[in-house]
């Protein structure tokens, strides 16, 4: 269950400090599926063709894993696929017409101290043939953005990167850098990019979802790309691609958090897990909350069994899968307590 056995005791201490989620019994709707073969944090989930694909992964020393796994709910089995061509982390991942798109991220600098170097790489993965294809690069280099699809185009929003004119090519917790409101759209039909109206609240590590051709960006991290005291936000903003405008602020997320898993189902956006750091604690969440854009209202759902951040999540049918992740907040003394847990929330369960 935990791949760093030396740190299991540390986890028990951390667990005692975790923020409590609403008082539901997770046994009511959550269940377990086949564990993830290579427990990792900073993995991203996307459903395509009735299967769940988990990509990415980050190990000790900020080493990107470039994992690609396919999960089949019909057989409850995982199959390893070809690794990502470029070993990067903190990606934006989405799917369109059965193809999976990976945008931006961070890599290790080739020289100098270990850090996060923002990239502009874009890739298309074809699950049917297990092949990768390089696409036109993003107009701007950034990591930890979020991506979704509206009307056949891919919107990549937010992220973290350097200040204009900075001599740094990478970012680090000890060096000044910034969150981004950048909004760029990719057209797969022409393999071209276009820059759109920036998001009013610059942020990264946010959840995103498209409902009725509008894009909702939820929570995330402001100020910089690394978890820090007060960096989480509860802000929810909506973008209308048809008129290239951002609307007024919407109902705030009840639990301000970043590095969550998420998925969209039946016109609602579900946000799961995440991490936090305050003056008195650092930890991860079990909380599960859903946002209904039609009513501009939040609801709480049964909590996960395991608190974690950097998990992969998405819906297959009416079941939300939340896979792997790190049970500790990043940046602390024991930052890689990874779990292979694959939890499933069945919205139709009674």
How should these model regions be labeled?
Residues 15, 26-350:
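Kelch-like beta-propeller repeat domains
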Residues 10-22:
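Bacterial N-terminal signal peptides
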Residues 1-7:
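N-terminal secretory signal peptides that target proteins for export/translocation
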């Amino acid at each position: 269950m935990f791949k760093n056995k030396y740190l299991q005791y540390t986890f028990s201490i951390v667990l005692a400090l975790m923020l409590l989620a609403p008082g539901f019994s997770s046994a009511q709707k959550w269940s377990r599926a086949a564990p993830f073969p290579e427990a990792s944090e900073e993995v991203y989930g996307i459903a395509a063709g009735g299967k769940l694909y988990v990509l990415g992964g980050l190990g000790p020393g900020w080493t990107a894993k470039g994992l690609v796994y396919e999960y089949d709910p019909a057989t409850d089995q995982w199959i390893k696929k070809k690794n990502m061509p470029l070993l990067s982390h903190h990606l934006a991942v989405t799917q369109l017409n059965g193809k999976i798109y990976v945008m931006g991220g961070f890599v290790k600098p080739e020289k100098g101290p270990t850090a996060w170097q923002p990239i502009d790489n874009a890739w298309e993965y074809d699950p049917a043939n297990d092949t990768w294809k390089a696409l036109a690069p993003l107009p701007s280099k950034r990591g930890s953005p979020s991506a979704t699809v509206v009307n056949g185009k891919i919107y990549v929003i937010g992220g973290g990167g350097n200040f204009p004119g900075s001599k740094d090519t990478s970012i680090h917790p000890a060096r000044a850098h910034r969150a981004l409101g950048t909004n760029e759209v990719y057209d797969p039909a022409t393999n071209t990019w276009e820059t759109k109206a920036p998001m009013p609240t610059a942020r990264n590590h946010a959840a995103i979802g498209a409902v009725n051709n509008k894009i909702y960006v939820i929570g995330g991290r402001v100020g910089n790309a690394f978890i820090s005291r007060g960096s989480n936000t509860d802000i929810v903003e909506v973008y209308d691609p048809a008129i290239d405008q951002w609307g007024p602020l919407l109902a705030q997320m009840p639990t301000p958090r970043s590095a969550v898993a998420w998925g969209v189902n039946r016109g609602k956006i579900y946000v799961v897990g995440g991490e936090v750091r305050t003056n008195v604690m650092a930890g991860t969440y079990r909380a599960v909350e859903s946002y209904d854009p039609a009513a501009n209202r939040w609801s709480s759902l049964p909590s996960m069994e395991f608190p974690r951040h950097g998990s992969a999540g998405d819906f297959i049918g009416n079941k939300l899968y939340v896979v792997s992740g790190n049970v500790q907040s990043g940046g602390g003394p024991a930052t890689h307590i990874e779990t292979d847990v694959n939890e499933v929330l069945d919205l139709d369960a009674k």
